[in-house]
């Protein structure tokens, strides 16, 4: 909605039990869309694969259901893909912290447990924090002006965003750029997506990075999509942290037994405070992740790789 280059929109209602059905129905009245409804949830990866199978365009762009697309979102992704074949696009992911108290940012209705906080807002504060359809269609700059870089609030997510985009722009030959993939703002040719088998449906978190790694192994190259802004409507509950929720890691590593996979969690944790490990073992950029993975080449096993990294970094400091 409000795109400078009209897209084909495929919406997957993956077994939702809330008012999602109504929201999709209302959207279908004002814009053309292809709708898929699942009685039972297939999970994030399964839902994305189902949507991709129904898409007819040459380029697939993935966007989460709680995320807005800026006016140049589609046109920027398409322009990037016109630069050459074999590209996987990563757009600029922002978040809207102002929506964190609302079940519906349009009306300002509170999330469960936030009733008192929302009731205490002045009319002016409520107006500043709501994100309405009118804002999206007629005055999107006001939405952008209220956003911050990163998918979630906080210094860590913002720094991660900055490091990922910096690596994509400044280190195009870095071998671990697949780790900069974004599930809520990522594009790939439909042909390449289908050829590699789509998302691994056994992985329900971090699936976008696993897909990006497979695509890169097949010869694709990660690239930044400047100007393709997405805006995550921040919510305090209902999201999963890949550092704390590590169910993805064993499946990911079984498919790709390379050191960079278990070292990703050290990279992410290095951006937090306090550190859960000695400061000398921090990994603070994707080129550093690449170097750390190279040092651990030949080490097999998730925990063995991490312990090898800790030992190697401690030894380097001791040698100095």
What are the functions of these language-model segments?
Residues 1-6:
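Short, acidic, metal-binding catalytic loop of nucleotide-sugar glycosyltransferases
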Residues 205-211:
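Acidic donor-binding loop at a coil-to-helix junction in glycosyltransferase catalytic cores
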């Amino acid at each position: 909605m409000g795109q400078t280059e009209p897209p084909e929109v495929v919406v997957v209602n993956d077994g939702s039990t809330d008012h999602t059905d109504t929201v999709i129905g209302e959207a279908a009245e004002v814009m053309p869309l292809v709708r898929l409804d699942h009685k039972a949830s297939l999970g994030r990866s399964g839902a994305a694969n189902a949507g991709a199978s129904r898409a007819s365009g040459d380029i697939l762009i993935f966007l989460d259901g709680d995320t807005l697309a800026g006016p140049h979102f589609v046109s920027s992704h398409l322009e990037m893909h016109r630069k050459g074949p074999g590209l996987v696009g990563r757009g600029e992911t922002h978040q809207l912290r102002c929506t964190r108290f609302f079940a519906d940012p349009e009306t300002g209705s509170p999330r469960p447990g936030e009733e008192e906080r929302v009731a205490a807002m002045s009319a002016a504060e409520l107006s500043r924090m709501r994100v309405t359809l009118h804002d999206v269609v007629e005055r999107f700059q006001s939405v952008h002006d209220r956003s911050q870089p990163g998918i979630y609030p906080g210094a860590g997510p913002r720094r991660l965003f900055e490091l990922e985009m910096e690596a994509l722009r400044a280190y195009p030959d870095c071998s671990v750029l697949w780790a900069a993939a974004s599930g809520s703002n990522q594009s790939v040719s439909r042909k390449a997506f289908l050829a590699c088998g789509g998302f691994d449906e056994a992985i329900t978190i971090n699936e976008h990075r696993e897909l990006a790694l497979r695509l890169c192994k097949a010869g694709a190259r990660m690239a930044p999509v400047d100007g393709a802004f997405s805006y995550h409507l921040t919510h305090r509950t209902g999201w999963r942290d890949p550092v704390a929720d590590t169910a993805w890691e064993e499946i990911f590593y079984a498919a790709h037994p390379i050191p960079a996979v278990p070292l990703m969690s050290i990279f992410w944790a290095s951006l937090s405070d306090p550190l859960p490990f000695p400061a000398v073992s921090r990994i603070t950029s994707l080129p550093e992740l690449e170097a750390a993975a190279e040092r651990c080449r030949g080490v097999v096993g998730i925990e063995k790789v991490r312990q090898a990294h800790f030992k190697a970094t401690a030894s380097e400091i001791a040698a100095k």
